[in-house]
Design a protein with these regions (language model features):
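Two-component/phosphorelay signaling modules centered on CheY-like receiver
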Residues: 14-34
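Active-site beta3 strand of CheY-like receiver
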Residues: 49-55
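Receiver (REC) domain active-site loop signature in two-component systems and cognate sites
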Residues: 60
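Acidic catalytic/metal-coordinating carboxylates
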Residues: 38-41, 64-70
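Alpha4 helix (beta4-alpha4-beta5 surface) of REC/receiver domains from two-component response regulators
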Residues: 67, 90-107
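Conserved sequence signature across two-component system core domains
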Residues: 10-11, 36, 54
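Conserved phosphotransfer cores of two-component systems
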Residues: 47-49, 73-80, 101
């Protein structure tokens, strides 16, 4: 059996996180291994679980998504997760900064 793609969701909107997790769990090849409610928790969970994919909201308490990218960039991880940024706003300046810090994709939330 093929290994599942592990996903960590970092978003302070609990309803959105649960809806997204529910959708991802229905995919045969994906497994949600954690849901962080703020940026500090996201960094800790990424360091401890090293997911294949990290879905990171830009606007979160304690540490925003840009801060999460900065912190995980400084961690000595054996493998950096593919980071996909989520945001309700699509500002070019923020998008460019996220990509510069290693985000692979930037998705504007509905």
């Amino acid at each position: 059996m093929k290994e599942k793609i592990t996903v960590l969701i970092a978003d302070d909107n609990k309803d959105f996180s649960q809806t997204l997790a529910g959708y991802l769990e229905k995919q045969e090849d994906m497994e949600v291994i954690g849901m962080a409610k703020d940026g500090a928790e996201a960094v800790e969970m990424i360091a401890n679980t090293i997911p294949d994919i990290a879905l990171i909201d830009i606007i979160m308490p304690h540490l925003d998504g840009i801060g999460v990218l900065e912190k995980i960039g400084k961690l000595n991880l054996p493998k950096r997760p593919t980071c996909i940024m989520l945001s309700a706003v699509g500002q070019d300046k923020i998008t460019q900064r996220a990509i510069l810090l290693g985000a692979e994709y930037y998705v504007v939330k509905p």
